Amino acid sequence: MITTAETYHVPVLLKESVDGLDIQPDGIYVDVTFGGGGHSKEILSRLGKKGHLYSFDQDADAEKNIVDDDRFTFVRSNFRYISQWMRYYEVEKIDGLLGDLGVSSHHFDDETRGFSFRFDAPLDMRMNKRAGQTAADILNNYSEEQLADVFYLYGELKNARRIAKAICDCRRQHEITTTGQLAEAVEPLMRSEREKKDMAKLYQALRIEVNHEMDALRDMLKGATDLLREGGRLSIITYHSLEDRIVKNVMKAGNAEGKVEQDFYGRISSPYRLVEKMITPTEDEQQRNPRSRSAKLRIAEKI
């Protein structure tokens, strides 16, 4: 499959998310989800000669979209390691951080990666093809209870236990290594009127577990909170309730759990103030890019 920066991933809420950073021409910014480079290019277009942008992506395929600009540094790494990498580049404080947490269209459309149930493909689902266990490893090695927990916690599937049992029954006959074999094992449990949505939730749960997405998000947001200077902006786009809850909690309370701390006078103590109400794509953007429909943009400023 031939992929260009334009087809790799169409940037969602492009203007709104970059506007939210309130770009300072000489500032230092981080795009933690480089992908096709759409958001990064927009940030660079607003930076002056002394500004700099660090962009993260753990997928080797994203390197094909690297920008040729002295003000740009590409970091091939999971964004959870932002603190370590900023230390490596001797960056003490940043002026803003942007994250588009959606899975790139490239991943859904690549038949070899196993991110979509539209194709019969190996069950991989790793964002970084060099690291960690695959979705097939999880399906064939996790206990029935572990699988049920993954499907319930990360897919919010009400029949998680029945799905886990069906998978374990199937793997006693043969290993589950392809998307087609997974579909064959669980299709009888998918509600006909919601089959696509339930399958999407199942795939979401597996992808989150494979890539440790929730832990990585918590680590990244903690690092961002430490790195942002006073007045620095956090601009994050989420696509499902699990990641949105974490982002909302961090912006409101300063921690992923949403535990509100108060000062001596009973005032809520948080490192952020909300800059905007939640922003969603316009009807026009949703029509142009249907994958933007569930996107939510939240913007906060370090105080």
Describe the residue ranges of each PLM region.
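S-adenosyl-L-methionine-dependent methyltransferase catalytic core, i.e., the SAM/SAH-binding region
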Residues: 1-303
